[in-house]
Swiss-Prot record:
Signal peptide: none annotated. This is Maturase K. One of its GO terms (biological process) is mRNA processing. It comes from Arabidopsis lyrata (Lyre-leaved rock-cress). The gene is matK. GO terms for molecular function: RNA binding. It is found in: Plastid, Chloroplast.
Length: 504
């Protein structure tokens, strides 16, 4: 974003946060479609696939679009003609897509400048390991072992476009930009049928920005209330009454109730609450009682319904007891496992046994969900039996082999933290046999005949890369003792989920 700072010196736009004039500057379109800023379209997006309308970008299209925006009436087209009405060889929806790309980039400018100014004079150590998805699992192993309940919340999406506009009002102070954004958003989303049929043409950067702004508003309210929440603490020998969360003034509360209870009232803030958000879900881990977990549950329901005007059912908030239930978290099934430990103690001539229980976070592979994903992509059937990949038979042998090896390594890389590797070996077996069947089908041969000819070479391709990585991490003696296959490994270089892992 540093490259934008030199362009924001015109007309006092930077000082007064006027973003609307930027929509009429050609260089902003050039920067918006720059490869460095548009890298989300090259990588696999969480929400949408790669867009292809950016290939049609040219300076002539930008100039015509700017001229058309000066005449705003020409942008208003009936919904039924949105796809048919063309302007210089492109539909009006195409121009709304270009504006959405530009709007996502423009709105990021004041936030990046504000963030950079707040960090001036401060020294921060950058830890790229914390960007990894696997970095959350060691944290949960240390924290969840001391908790007993987890609140699993499905974050709802806003059902009305005006909710998104209202959220942006707190961030963008430029009224012209907000009105223009509202106009383009409504015109862009009116064609509902076209949106459903042509999901691949949508802009992932634009909708990722809208989703993040929506979630940021929700989390700011939640964290504000969480810091100010308290519950009553009563001694066991005094009057017992329910611990109630409240958000009123503490002094007024004491004036009302201090004369009615002979017990000494105490306020206690429970610090043992951890919040983690991933994709469209969030979890709230705590050591509270089931009664307080239910109150947190209905707090989320009331927050979404009353503040965001979103109908949110209580069934979308699940209370899981980690000692009994499994928590589906980032492609893993996590639960607490009790490991009994017997310690023999001896004092002088007497010896006795001490039974201890060690609580450990157990992470398992959801084999049924992954087999369902593999079956959906035609690697196997619904029962987990490998089948040939017919759509890949037109590729070369090396290309087919490299595809299967890459998928197998990615899944093995991600699920290396599983406590039970049996399911991981089953997934590898499905992919290897699917690769053999695909190559045998291409060469019009049987699987047995093909394995006799290239069996050892094929197996070596699947094992070489993974063994080389593990041998660099662990010493040779540890690697040779086969204890490595019982150890959980968390890699700190995984920045996004694979499609087969992202089965939610």
């Amino acid at each position: 974003m540093e490259k934008f700072q030199g362009y924001l010196e015109f007309d006092g736009a930077r000082q007064q946060s006027f973003l609307y004039p930027l929509f009429f500057r050609e260089y902003i379109y050039v920067l918006a479609y720059d490869h460095g800023l548009n890298r989300l379209n090259r990588n696999r997006s969480i929400f949408l696939e790669n867009t292809d309308y950016d290939k049609k970008y040219s300076s002539l299209i930008v100039k015509r679009l700017i001229l058309r925006m000066y005449e705003q009436n020409r942008l208003i087209i009936p919904t039924k003609d949105l796809n048919q009405n063309s302007f210089l060889g492109h539909t009006s929806l195409f121009y709304y897509q270009m504006i959405s790309v530009l709007f996502a980039v423009i709105v990021e400018i004041p936030f990046s400048l504000r963030l950079g100014s707040s960090f001036q004079g401060k020294q921060f150590k950058k830890s790229y390991n914390l960007q990894s998805i696997h970095s959350i699992f060691p944290f949960l192993e240390d924290k969840l072992a001391h908790f007993n309940y987890v609140l699993d919340v499905l974050i709802p999406y806003p059902i009305h476009l005006e909710i998104l506009v209202q959220i942006l009002r707190y961030w963008v102070k430029d009224a012209s930009s907000l009105h223009f954004f509202r106009f383009c958003l409504y015109e862009y989303c009116n064609c509902k049928n076209f949106y459903i049929k042509k999901k691949s043409i949508l802009n992932p950067r634009f909708f990722l920005f809208l989703y993040n702004s929506h979630v940021c508003e929700y989390e700011s309210i939640f964290f504000f209330l969480r810091k100010r929440s308290s519950h009553l603490r009563s001694p066991s020998y005094e009057v017992l009454f329910e611990r109630i969360f409240f958000y009123g003034k503490i002094q007024d509360f004491f004036k009302v109730f201090v004369n009615n209870f002979p017990a000494i009232l105490g306020l206690l803030k429970d610090p043992f609450i951890h919040y983690v958000r991933y994709h469209g879900r969030c979890i709230l881990a705590t050591k509270d009682t089931p009664l307080l977990m239910n109150k947190w549950k209905y707090f989320f329901v009331n927050l979404w319904q009353c503040y965001f005007s979103v109908w949110f059912q209580s069934q979308k908030v699940n209370i899981n007891q980690l000692s009994k239930d499994n928590l589906e978290f980032l492609g893993y099934l996590s639960s607490l496992r009790l490991n009994p430990l017997v310690v023999r103690s001896q004092m002088l001539e007497n010896s006795f046994l001490i039974d201890n229980v060690r609580i450990k976070l157990d992470s398992k592979i959801p084999i049924s969900s992954i087999i369902g994903s593999l079956a959906k992509d035609k690697f196997c059937n619904v029962l987990g039996h490998p089948i040939s990949k017919a759509t890949w038979t037109d590729s070369s042998d090396s290309d087919i082999l490299n595809r299967f090896v890459r998928i197998c390594r990615n899944i093995s890389h991600y699920y290396s933290g599983s406590s039970k590797k049996k399911n991981l070996y089953r997934i590898k077996y499905i992919l290897r046999l699917c690769c053999v069947k695909t190559l045998a089908r291409k060469h019009k041969s049987t699987v047995r005949a093909f394995l006799k000819r290239l069996g050892s070479v094929l197996l070596e391709e699947f094992l070489t890369g993974e063994d080389q990585v593990l041998s660099l991490i662990f010493p040779r003696s540890y690697y040779a003792s086969k204890r490595l296959y019982r150890v959980r490994i968390w890699y700190l270089d995984i920045l996004y989920l694979n499609d087969l892992v992202n089965h939610e």
